Amino acid sequence: AETYSEGQSEKNIGDLLSALPVKDKFYISSKARLDPKSSESFGSQIDRKLDNSLKRLKTDKLDLYQLHNKITFEEGVETLTSAQILEKNGVCDIMEKIKEDSRVDHIGLTALGDTKPIRDVVNTGCFDTAQIYYNLLNPTATFKEKGIWNDQDFSNLVSDCQTQNMGILGIRVFAAGLLATDIRHGREIPVTHMIDIKEEERRVQRIYKVVGQTYGNRAQLAVRYGLSAESLHCTVLGLATLEHLQ
């Protein structure tokens, strides 16, 4: 995303990709978070952010460009409503135009925020992909019914994406690190609505008390759980070091 380390993350990737043989094909994606409070139009924001990302990534096209904002009932400082996305000349129409001018091949959304407006946007078929919250703490996106689950209910979200033939990317497999390690970095902020960080910590401890080391260490279990969901086409991982990858 263009906001990660103020663009340095994209620059690092661009430097690496430009040093690799042309024959090595990678799929490149990025994300843009729009400012609904800005006097700059959404169209201008997307054009500017996309062009800057392309420059940092040293490419003339992205395979996937995603809307980074949460989708909520009411507009927030960094959140958009379904109406702002779906209205004529709204975000969806603007992002379709960047496909038409060949700067991106596919467009996607981040399926965080309030479940109903997220599903409303998904069910239009406007977007090609969705980043879906899915991990050991909340796997409800793959459920048909919420049942007794008492965290935010994302049930039927994956089913909706499948109906629209969308690519489905699992995100937050480590729950901001809570599932991966006991070490805390201070940015463990829940992105769901129903439970706080203290309750998430309690549930993490219960999970690992039951499962133990059966499936490897904590990080390995969390990744395996994400990869085990056959309805997800890929799992997005955040890695800071080569040791994390290994």
Q: What do the PLM-derived regions correspond to, one by one?
A:
Residues 9, 13, 46, 50, ...:
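Aromatic/hydrophobic pocket-lining residues that form the small-molecule binding cavity
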Residues 24-37, 136:
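A short, structured active-site edge motif that brings together acidic residues
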Residues 70-246:
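Beta/alpha (TIM)-barrel catalytic core signal, keyed to glycine-rich beta->alpha loops juxtaposed to Asp/Glu
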Residues 45-66, 97, 101:
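CE4/NodB-like, metal-dependent polysaccharide N-deacetylase domain
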Residues 41-56, 113-121, 222:
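Short, acidic/polar
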Residues 1-26:
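N-terminal binding-site loop/beta-alpha segment at the start of enzyme catalytic domains
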Residues 4-5, 35-38, 113:
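Glycine-/small-residue-rich active-site loops that bind phosphorylated ligands and cofactors
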Residues 23-26, 60-64, 105-106:
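Short acidic capping loops at alpha-helix termini that bridge into adjacent secondary structure
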